[in-house]
Every structure is written in structure tokens, then in C-alpha cells.
Design a protein with these regions (language model features):
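C-terminal segment of N-terminal export signals and the immediately downstream linker at the start
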Residues: 1, 19-39
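N-terminal export signals
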Residues: 6-25
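Short, polar/charged alpha-helical segment
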Residues: 29-37, 44, 49-70, 163
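Extracytoplasmic ligand-binding site segments that recognize negatively charged/polar headgroups
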Residues: 46-58, 73-81, 96-257
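Short, hydrophobic alpha-helical packing/hinge segments within bilobed ligand-binding/sensory domains
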Residues: 82, 110, 259-260, 320, ...
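Extracytoplasmic/periplasmic substrate-binding proteins
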Residues: 246-309, 313, 359
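Conserved C-terminal helix/tail region of periplasmic/extracytoplasmic solute-binding proteins
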Residues: 261, 368-403
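Mature extracytoplasmic/periplasmic domains
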Residues: 301, 306-375
Length: 403
């Protein structure tokens, strides 16, 4: 059942944000809870990070205790695998009893599912905890790679690109993209990025695009006729740095954990992360040197939100909605922000929370390597999803796949 505390949070949030009361009536949500009790959510989510896997396992225990919902984490190498599964079911005429109940998603995968009618909803704006979401202060929670979410996915974490470095080996990191290029070419083998189409590798390419394009505002529009001219400076930049990358760019790390391990092993001096708290979490776990810190480039770095979405033919829609709402609980958001757990940034409007929840966030030690919100600087909006798709294709055509 809905607790008094939940309704207190909803009322306070609505008042603080100037919103109407949540559209979910108690009876409506109670019927969702009743239906969800005893269901198993098959959550298809990236499984490449042990810390995230542990968090999902912990969340499953919470869902079981609070709502009688079991979470089965289907660990993905690529979100596209889950999208392909749902698409295949749609093409086969399977409109019910789908294999996927919930997907960790954003960007081009959300765009593809929304375009093909593969999503259930809108549901996110109907969740009891939705009024706690910082829609005004964090527009990325309702706009995914320029595409309005329209309630078809629910946010659960914020991310922003940061660079990690070891102060013992690099006292002063480069502050601009041009300075980074100069540093890379002057220090052969000490930098690399994950191999596209890995999301972090593509994020690095998009960050470079922001810095070298004549008119970066074009990134907010779908790829057009000017694409070749727009991206020419990107390929020129990569052509300059690739000979100086780790292993002379004959191989690339597979993903963010593999990239971070290179920094941990002192094989590289500068790394990347899409989680500003990752370095602090790894230091706390003893996996990174205590001298590691983070920095961002002048002018800002790319940021976005992570979401969960429910396929149109999900077998357990009620339980999936319960998990989506649970992810927005303040105490769970605070746990995710703890650098000892994940170090993710919250999607909530902290000013709208009850004092006890505000204190929980305020009491978090974000870690020695985590930049303050002010130091993180401006967030650059994700480009339209079509840029990500086209750049990944062209990167492979130009540089091939490492073996």
C-alpha cells in the first residue's frame, strides 16, 4: 500500500514545484501495487559494471520486501539486444507476454523504440514519485537526445562526462580540447577511449564534435546534407591523435570499466567516465590510487539522463511500473549517489524533498575526486540520436574493429 510518507512527499513536491497534485489517485496506484504483488520483472540492463549489478541486486531485495516484486536482471552487453528482441516479437505479432518487462535505456535506442511503437505508456508522469523529479532544473529528464520523452520512459540517474587523471603523474590536466590534443600527441600511449559503438567512446567523439564544429547547434537537429562538412574536423582530430593513443590505436578498450582499469594499472594517465562519482567510488573500493582526481573541459561536457522504459507487450507492466517508481524514492536515489555504491547524480529536486531526505543527501561524502556541481560546469545537451548512429558507422568504416 502507499505509505503516508509517500503522499507527504508528493504533496510537498507539488507545492514546491507549483505543480498540480499527482494524477495518480490512491485507488489507481493501489490497484497497480495489488497486481504487481507476486510478479517478476525481467529487467534488461547493461551488465558490464559489477557495482551497478550489485545495486540492481540490492534494489531487487527492496522491491521484494516492500512490494512483493522480484527483479530478474538480464545482463546485456548492448541495450540494442533488448530492443531487437522486442522488435522481433512485434514483427511476429506477439502483442502480449513479451520477454522484456523493463529496459535501462536512452538515446538512439529510445528513439528507435518510440518510432516503431515498441513502448508502453505514457506511464512515467503517472508515477506517485514523479512530482519529485526536477523537471525544471534538469531538462534532460524529459528530453532524451533532443526527443521529448512524453512519459514513455522514467529517469533514474543523471550523468555527465568527466576526465579522470592521476595527480601523481599529471599535476595539471589540460583544460581545453585543443590542449588535450596537444597533450595526447606529446605523450604517446597515455590516452585512449572505448571502441565505438560503446556509449562512452561515442560520447568522447560527440564531445570532440562540440569543440571542433563551426556551428555546434546543428547537433540538435537530425543529420542533414551538411554532415560531411560538419564532421570533417572530427575525423581530422582523430587522425591526429590516433597514432599517439594507447597501443597506437591498434586496439581499444571495450567499455568504461576496461578503460578505467588502464588508469588503475598506470597504462594511461587520463581516462573518461560518464559518472562524475566513479573515481571516488573506485578510490573508496581500493581500485584506484588515492591521488586520482577528475576535471572537465572549459565550456562544458556532455550530460544526459538514464531512463527505464516498458515495452508495449511486457508481461508484467504493473511490476515494471512499481520498480520505476521505486527508483525515484529519495532514499534509493541517495544510495545511488553515494560514491561507495554508484556515485550517480540524482534526478530529484532536492529542494522539494522533506527535510530528512534533504539531510540524507547533504550528509553524503561525495568523495575526494568528485567535482562539486559548480565545478562540473555547464552540461552540453546530447546531440540528436541520428548523429550517434551515423558517427558510429563512419568510425567503423574509417578505423575498423580492433581484434
Amino acid at each position: 500500500m502507499i505509505t503516508r510518507r509517500q503522499f507527504g512527499q508528493m504533496g510537498l513536491a507539488a507545492s514546491a514545484l507549483g505543480l498540480c497534485p499527482p494524477r495518480v489517485r490512491a485507488a489507481d496506484w493501489q490497484s497497480v501495487l495489488d497486481e504487481a504483488n507476486g510478479q517478476t520483472v525481467w529487467w534488461h540492463a547493461w551488465g558490464g559494471d559489477p557495482k551497478i549489478n550489485d545495486f540492481i541486486e540490492w534494489l531487487g531485495a527492496e522491491a521484494e520486501v516492500r512490494h512483493g516484486v522480484t527483479i530478474n536482471h538480464v545482463k546485456l552487453a548492448s541495450t540494442a539486444d533488448a530492443v531487437a528482441r522486442v522488435l522481433a516479437e512485434q514483427q511476429a505479432g506477439q502483442t502480449e507476454e513479451g520477454a522484456v518487462d523493463l529496459i535501462w535505456i536512452n538515446g538512439e535506442n529510445f528513439a528507435a523504440m518510440k518510432d516503431k511503437g515498441l513502448l508502453y505508456g505514457p506511464f512515467a508522469t503517472e508515477l506517485p514519485n514523479w512530482p519529485l523529479v526536477d523537471v525544471a532544473g534538469k531538462p534532460a529528464v524529459v528530453t532524451d537526445f533532443t526527443l521529448p520523452t512524453e512519459g514513455y520512459e522514467s529517469p533514474w540517474a543523471m550523468a555527465q562526462l568527466v576526465f579522470e587523471y592521476d595527480t601523481a603523474r599529471l599535476p595539471t590536466p589540460p583544460a581545453t580540447l585543443a590542449a588535450l590534443k596537444d597533450w595526447i600527441t606529446a605523450h604517446p600511449g597515455r590516452f585512449t577511449y572505448p571502441q565505438p559503438p560503446d556509449y562512452l567512446g561515442l560520447t568522447f567523439l560527440k564531445q570532440v564534435l562540440y569543440g571542433v564544429m563551426a556551428d555546434p547547434t546543428r547537433l540538435q537537429q537530425p543529420v542533414g546534407e551538411g554532415y560531411t562538412a560538419d564532421t570533417a574536423p572530427l575525423w581530422a582530430f582523430l587522425d591526429q591523435i590516433h597514432p599517439a593513443l594507447w597501443r597506437q590505436s591498434r586496439a581499444f578498450p571495450e567499455n568504461e570499466p576496461a578503460l578505467g582499469q588502464l588508469l588503475a594499472d598506470a597504462e594511461t594517465d587520463i581516462s573518461l567516465s560518464f559518472n562524475p562519482g566513479r573515481a571516488s567510488a573506485e578510490i573508496a573500493a581500493g581500485n584506484l590510487a588515492p591521488t586520482v582526481r577528475t576535471f572537465v573541459l572549459q565550456g562544458g561536457t556532455i550530460g544526459n539522463a538514464s531512463f527505464v522504459a516498458i515495452p508495449f507487450n511486457a508481461s508484467h507492466r504493473a511490476a515494471a511500473q512499481v520498480v520505476a517508481n521505486l527508483l525515484l524514492e529519495p532514499e534509493i536515489q541517495a544510495r545511488a549517489q553515494d560514491p561507495n555504491i554508484l556515485g550517480f547524480q540524482t534526478v530529484l529536486n532536492l529542494a522539494a524533498l522533506p527535510e530528512e531526505d534533504q539531510n540524507a543527501f547533504a550528509g553524503l561524502d561525495l568523495g575526494v575526486a568528485t567535482l562539486s556541481p559548480q565545478a562540473l560546469g555547464p552540461v552540453l545537451l546530447e546531440p540528436h540520436a541520428s548523429w550517434m548512429v551515423k558517427i558510429a558507422e563512419d568510425w567503423q568504416a574509417r578505423y575498423g574493429l580492433s581484434k
